Design a protein with these regions (language model features):
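N-terminal secretory signal peptides
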Residues: 1-15, 22-34
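Bacterial lipoprotein signal-peptidase II cleavage site
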Residues: 36-46
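Extracytoplasmic low-complexity, Pro/Thr/Ser/Ala/Gly-rich segments
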Residues: 46-120, 133, 192, 196-240, ...
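Surface-exposed edge beta-strand/loop patches
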Residues: 67-70, 149-217, 351, 373-386, ...
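The feature marks short-to-medium sequence segments in extracytoplasmic or secretory-pathway proteins
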Residues: 103-152, 264-268, 405, 418-482
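Second-shell loop/turn segments in exported
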Residues: 147-148, 246-255, 290-294, 477-478
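Periplasmic peptidoglycan-binding/anchoring modules of Gram-negative envelope and division proteins
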Residues: 223-236, 246-281, 305, 309-312, ...
Length: 529
């Protein structure tokens, strides 16, 4: 069964699992990528590098009997085939078809395959994405009829997830299936071209649920030494520099490290020669009185503004400099560590010509000479994998490759074991401080699979609901492993623009678990979709 600890109401905003797709295929041959195999139109899927877990996991072909993309994977130890799509838009909604089958002679129950907790029996945790547009769509239907009972050999099931309407001009989407993979290149067709009744699906759906979205994906990075972090969407970039590194204690005098910390901002300014709006805002903790903190925050913001003018030409930018004192903390001021997070200066750049940047959409530069932190756990090449411990048991963790799609990298870490492993999800979460700096909501998500590149730690892509809850595109539950079976942890990251990547699961404490998985996977090939 799955392992997911009940959590606050934030879970109700069901996390999109930003997933993994698959093996490289020849783009010139019209290949579509998903899971762990080569996806070819009209042909059989050929396996790619398999490192570790056995079994038919995540191999997809582009065309199934219903016109969708076929994903061959594994669920709870059973071979599973899911034909995903096509999808059709009608009015305010997009409807997809999942045709689910297995070669297992044993019953395979699907009630927890695509959702957990209060949403069992539905496809509520499936996510539809348009990575080219940096958009994610939550599932709205909540239909409990489709996935009741079991699927067995010769007795498939159909499910029909419902999402908000896609934008005009979208011809294909990505679809994330929890613990299975991300299917890429799912065709968007006319209502008349699908072999199911779109009106009937919409009529049966419970459409009084979550905000239909879509929600914008954001990219976030943290400097190797934690002195700054950056978030970015399609309109703006915000660099937050730590007050304790940039300034002397209780002072507006810049430290010797200030220029290297501000290098991230300088690089962002240089990317947009036409300029735009530049907002610099100082913040403090709550240690002194309000008046002192307000004055200090204003002086620090002004000091950053003046220093940036000396470091680079910012004359094309319309600048606004202010301080907010202790009035806008990132986290509660209830511990020394959290007060340190709140002492900061935020620099937001909103370029007038966002397309002007020649860098990767995720780019948030830092000096390439920045020291890569020493590994805190086992190290191995991604396709070969490493052994890690969970609940005192040994698991093998691998990742064959990642795929570049629409300004993102997608991939999945695969877990296998020769013994039964009771596996909670909390050991796969970021350290508490890093999670709070990013403002991630809740505690039960796979969020610790970061990429190290060019002096920065790239966090998993994430998005925020209207109520402010921010969640990564990854699993929010995992299943206990049985001997000889596999489980996939699909993830999406910002594109770092390299031919191979290193995934690092950083060390650090986390309030909700006594153990965290700490490891590093290197030399992971990047394949262009």
């Amino acid at each position: 069964m799955s392992s997911s600890t009940p959590m606050c109401s934030e879970t109700c905003a069901r996390l999109t699992r930003r997933g993994v797709l698959a093996l490289p295929a020849l783009a010139g041959a019209g290949a579509v990528l998903a899971g762990c195999g080569v996806l070819k139109k009209g042909g059989s899927a050929s396996s790619g590098k398999s490192s570790g877990a056995a079994s038919p996991r995540a191999v997809a072909t582009a065309t199934g009997p219903h016109g969708g993309v076929v994903l061959s994977t594994e669920y709870q130890g059973a071979p599973m085939t899911v034909e995903v799509g096509p999808v059709a838009v009608k009015g305010k909604y997009t409807v997809a078809r999942f045709h689910i089958s297995t070669d297992s002679k044993e019953d395979v129950y699907l009630s927890q395959a695509f959702a957990q907790l209060e949403n069992v029996g539905t496809t509520a945790d499936v996510r539809m994405m348009s990575l080219e547009q940096s958009l994610v769509y939550v599932e709205l239907g909540g239909n409990t009829e489709d996935l009741s009972g079991a699927v067995t050999k010769g007795a498939p099931k159909d499910a029909f997830p419902v999402f908000g309407a896609l934008n005009d001009g979208v011809h294909s989407v990505e679809m994330l299936l929890p613990n299975m993979g991300v299917v890429v290149g799912v065709p968007v067709v006319k209502e008349s071209e699908v072999d199911f009744n779109v009106d009937d699906v919409i009529a049966k759906a419970n459409l009084q649920g979550p905000d239909p979205g879509p929600f914008k994906l954001e990219r976030a990075t943290v400097s190797m030494d934690g002195s700054s972090d950056t978030k970015q969407d399609e309109k703006s970039t915000t660099v937050t520099v730590a007050g304790d590194v940039t300034f002397a204690t209780d002072s507006d005098q810049l430290s010797a490290q200030a220029d290297s910390v501000l290098a991230t901002v300088v690089e962002q300014i240089k990317k947009f020669p036409s300029g735009g709006e530049l907002t610099i805002t100082g913040h403090t903790d709550d240690v002194a009185d309000d008046a002192h903190n307000q004055d200090l925050s204003e002086r620090r913001a002004k000091a950053v503004s003046e220093r940036l003018k000396k470091l680079t030409d910012s004359s094309a930018w319309k600048e606004s400099v202010s301080g907010k004192g202790e009035s806008s903390p990132r986290v509660p001021n209830d511990t020394d560590e959290r007060r340190q997070i709140n002492r900061r200066v935020e620099i937001t750049l909103t370029p007038s010509k966002a397309a002007e940047s020649s860098a990767s959409p995720s780019a948030s530069e830092a000096p390439s000479s920045a020291t890569v932190p020493d590994p805190a756990g086992p190290v191995g090449k991604g396709p070969e994998g490493v052994d890690v411990k969970v609940s005192g048991k040994t698991m093998h963790m691998t990742i064959d490759h990642v795929v570049r799609v629409g300004g993102y990298l997608t991939g999945k870490v695969v877990l296998t074991s020769s013994e039964a492993v009771s596996m909670p999800v909390a050991p796969f979460a970021l350290p508490g401080k890093m999670m709070e700096m990013r403002g991630l909501s809740g505690v039960w998500y796979v969020s610790s699979l970061t990429i190290l590149s060019d002096g920065l730690r790239y966090l998993e892509a994430d998005y925020a609901y209207p109520n402010g809850n921010r969640v990564p595109l990854a699993n929010n539950f995992v299943y206990s492993l049985e001997p000889g079976t596999s489980q996939s942890l699909p993830v999406v990251w910002p594109d770092v623009g390299e031919d191979s990547i290193t995934i690092d699961m950083p060390a650090g404490e986390y309030l909700y678990t006594k153990e965290r998985v700490v490891a590093r996977l290197t030399d992971i090939p990047v394949v262009n979709a």
